[in-house]
Amino acid sequence: MKSKWKLFFSCYFAFFVNGAMVLLVGAILPYLIEEAGISYSVAGGLLSAFAIGNLLASFVNPPLAGKIGRKATIVSMSALIPLMWLIITWIPPVPVLYAAFVLLGIGRGSVSIINNAVVNDNSDGKPAALNLLHMTFAVGAFLSPFLTSLY
């Protein structure tokens, strides 16, 4: 039971951070528009690129997990998230921004897919564990604006 709680806690924490990260995408757009001098349509395209990446995770993740395993997949796909945020902070040319937002979405979607699978596989068919997983995402998304306003 203790090892299951440890496993679930890491999934819950990852979903909390994932929820907070998703709201950051919208929060940074006004600054990105100003600093990079991009139009609202390009900024909207970046949001679409993020959503497309999230969708692409459904196609990238299963074969990758089958080839290298879940653990290596979650580590490599999770590593995309801070790496893409770092690239975005450098305010590269727009095509690079689009690619970074797609890869950011793939990383976010992969975290979601694998955490859902791990919790589902280890919850003995009880929905409470998955409900709690998605609640932690919502709490992270809710608290994100408050946490970012501290800085």
Where are these regions (language model features)?
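Conserved MFS/SLC helix-loop-helix module at the cytosolic interface between two early adjacent transmembrane helices
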Residues: L56-P95
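Extracytoplasmic
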Residues: K6-L32, I38, S112, N116
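Hydrophobic core of transmembrane alpha-helices in multi-pass small-molecule transporters
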Residues: M84, P95-S110
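Juxtamembrane helix-start elements in MFS-like secondary transporters
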Residues: L29, I38-L47, L130
